[in-house]
Amino acid sequence: VASTTQPTPSTLVLDKLAAIAVDKGVQPVIVCTKGDLAEAEFLRSAYEKSTLPFIRIDYGSGAGLDEVKQWISGRLCAFCGNSGVGKSTLLNALLPDAARETSAISQKLGRGRHTTREVTIFEAFGGRIADTPGFASLEANRAGFIPKENLEHAFPEFGPYLGQCQFTGCSHRTEKGCAVRQALAEGKLSQTRYDSYCAMYDEV
């Protein structure tokens, strides 16, 4: 779950969460909340060249909520993201009886305050929703993160180019003859997503 305005969206955090999900065999879906506060084109453009589903929520019109419900149906879904991005607000919009506590963004820190302090599971729409506590940062070098040799596979849009590089074991960062970097240069891949890959590669 991501915000388009407050707190400022971090594509690196989103990409870390998405990569962890892919590595563990979980389908990530990017849900952009607070879409009624500003245009979501920044986030949309970052993911339009990826294979990740992207949903923009407009609480004024209700746009996007039905699509979220469809993803929940028949599944166990976890709402994850930074504090203040609107996870509890999204849950309240989907399940008014949930009455999850929400809070304003800290003007001093520019980020959300923790209002959800434990994981709570709700039965809804033929599936289950796990509302998880927010966080301020997500470090890629913690135990259980993606092994460096698996990281390229955690970016599904890299898939068509893997195994096509000039050198075996290509890291897709500085090597000549890299098919991933060539696809990036040709505009087939998102620069933002590629930058996240490089940042994560340096962390793990």
Question: Which stretches of residues belong to each language-model region?
Answer:
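Short, well-ordered secondary-structure micro-motifs
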Residues: 10-11, 41-42, 67, 92, ...
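Canonical P-loop GTPase G-domain recognition
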Residues: 34-85
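Conserved ATP-binding TGD loop and adjacent catalytic N/P-domain core of P-type ATPases
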Residues: 79, 92-96, 102
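Walker A/P-loop
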Residues: 83, 88-89, 93
